[in-house]
A protein has these predicted regions:
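Substrate-binding/catalytic lobe of Class I Rossmann-like enzymes that use SAM or dcSAM, i.e.
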Residues: 120-216
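Core SAM-dependent methyltransferase catalytic element
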Residues: 175, 226-238
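A short, conserved alpha-helix within the catalytic core of class I
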Residues: 82-97
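Conserved SAM-binding loop of SAM-dependent methyltransferases across substrates and taxa
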Residues: 7-19
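Conserved SAM/SAH-binding beta-strand->alpha-helix loop
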Residues: 29-31
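Conserved beta-strand signature within the Rossmann-like core of class I S-adenosyl-L-methionine
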Residues: 97-115
Length: 238
């Protein structure tokens, strides 16, 4: 059961190794997900792949006929770090609930981005090529499409800040000049240097994340890290 499945490429590798009988990909975009399911079933003819359109931050009802035993919830990458800690624990609890009872033998396989030197984080979240900056400014273009505002993305500068106390990277957009932004029914003056806080990315130690898993009802875990200790994959079960 993959949350935020996208094109299912990570799940494809895992399915080749684990040989599951069923796969459920969950994502907000159903059409794209269905296409990925067809590709999975074409390449892995023994696999029954299903697409489920859902917002993973909301309660999810799995198919009624999905086998209860030995479910594996798969949440790769490190997206759990984009949620506030209390919300992350709620999501982990929801993942645990998908597994059924402890005797059903289910588990969670999840990735987390570990703490690392500040200069490494800064280079990743404020890269020289400007990829992250463009991604962050695109938030304003998206807001314009959604609500009809008139933000000019080029009038804002991307800034990434590491908060060592909270162990998180914060992404901000900083106004490059005084500007008035309008939207239907209102507007707002932004002064030069004023910031919009767009995103957080928490960097949990294995110990801190283990405590969160315990809060969510997981009793056992094992983990793997890369040689530098910058990323971890954790298998947790009840």
């Amino acid at each position: 059961i993959e949350l935020g499945a996208g094109n299912c490429e990570k799940a494809r590798s895992l399915c080749l190794r684990l040989q599951p009988s069923e796969f459920v990909g969950i994502d907000i975009s159903f059409d794209h997900l269905q296409e990925a399911m067809r590709g999975l079933e074409a390449d892995l003819p023994w696999l029954h792949a299903r697409a489920l359109a859902a917002d993973i931050t909301q309660p999810i009802r799995l198919p009624d006929d999905l086998p209860q035993q030995r479910r594996l919830v798969f949440y790769p990458g490190s997206s759990i770090g984009n949620f506030e800690p209390a919300h992350a624990v709620q999501l982990l609890t929801q993942m645990r609930d998908m597994l059924g009872a402890p005797e059903d033998g289910g588990g969670l396989l999840i990735g987390i981005d570990l703490p690392k030197p500040v200069h490494v984080l800064q280079a990743a979240y404020d890269d020289a090529a400007g990829v992250t900056a463009a991604f962050n400014r695109n938030v304003l273009a998206h807001v314009n499409r959604l609500v009809g505002s008139d933000f000019v993305p080029d009038h804002w500068k991307h800034r990434a800040i590491f908060d060592s106390e909270l162990s998180r990277i914060e992404m901000h957009l900083v106004a490059l000049s005084n500007q008035h932004v309008r939207w239907p029914g209102g507007g707002r003056e932004f002064l030069m240097g004023e910031r919009i806080h767009t995103e957080n990315s928490y960097k949990y130690s294995k110990e801190a994340f283990a405590a969160m898993l315990k809060q969510a009802g997981f009793s056992h875990l094992r983990s793997w890290t890369d040689e530098q200790g910058w990323f971890a994959v954790i298998h947790a079960w009840q």
